[in-house]
Amino acid sequence: MQKPFTQRIHLTALIAAAGAVPAGALAAGSPVTTLSQLLTDSGITESGYVAASYYHSSGYNTDHQFDTSHDTFQLDQAGLQLAFQPKSGFGAVVDVIAGEDAKIVNAAESASASSSNAFDILQGYAQYVTGPLTIQAGKFTTLAGAEVIAPTGNTNFSRSFLFYAEPMTHTGLRATYALTDTVSVIVGINNGWNYTKVDYGSKTGEFGIALNPDKYFSLTAQAYIGKDPVDLASRTFFDTVATFNATSALSFVVSYDWGRQDASAVTAGGDWDGIAAYANYQWSSQWRVSLRGEYFDDRNGFITGTAQKLKEGTITLGYDPVSDFELRLEGRYDTSNAPGFVKAVTAASTVLTDNQTEIAMQGVFKF
């Protein structure tokens, strides 16, 4: 097995090699090696995307994760990933994002209300693979949820209430063991929900199982249990996601979450749970539609700040004029049994309401 460090490409050597190529050889039609080819030959894969949007809300999109303004054009995310992941031995992944979404991720990682830092190392970890065992050390995205941070992994523009109430990243250790070709188990230990570092010893355990018996059905279940470093008390969270591919064009997804934060000197704690269901239909090579319906019960107001029951319905139309670009048009309606949405903010007061509406358009380019 070749050691990973022997795969490095030295810039000086590339420049020297380029200078040594006679101009006549290029003129004669000799093939030119591209950077992408050099990376591929060295075992490094690269991928990326740019997502930008315009959206308008009747209020300020309270309890949404990334689309939090009233009326705006914005760069959602520009992402780039480099990965060296051989089937055995050492490897590494670096995944960086920039844009408005990165500010939200940075704020979550610093346990602050907001951040002006529009750049984030979303994932950065080393890994070691031996047989059915993969060990990762560093920062990685969560196992929880049907939706992900990268817009390329979602069928809707906006994220669900469930996504808002889930962790996004973890920093620590994760081990995945493939029991069979269709069953894997995951265990890990990390700093907790989104924390890149903590000043003392509180840690969170990560547990998961993934079942993929055939191309029609898959099921994942994951749990996070540990003392939260900021809320200073135990937090328990369980999530499961089931996917059913009825045909090559029609799929259904159901996601259920349950969580509890114990009370402490700094928080009253609370329980929450919710369920989201998705239906996705690709009716041609260029057109698709995605529907999402959701119910979220924040009994004690720990997640949203208001004890309330939330519901939402979302429809997203996707159009792919070419294979690496998608245009999305979305409509969403949120309701609550309490006035928990911010409708307007003035110098004198904040106006609350029990519903909010959003329309959005997003373009996603992948490379």
Language model regions located:
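Hydrophobic alpha-helical segments, especially transmembrane helices
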Residues: R8-L11, F140, V289, G293
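Short hydrophobic/aromatic segments of transmembrane alpha-helices and their interfaces
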Residues: I9-H10, Q74, E166-P167, D271, ...
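Short, contiguous, pocket-lining structural segments
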Residues: P167, K197-T204, V230-F237
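Outer-membrane beta-barrel pore domains
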Residues: Q2-P4, H64-D67, E109-N117, P213-F367
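Outer membrane beta-barrel
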Residues: G29-N194, G201-K203, A210-S218, Y278-Y281, ...
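Cleavable N-terminal export/targeting peptides
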Residues: M1-S30
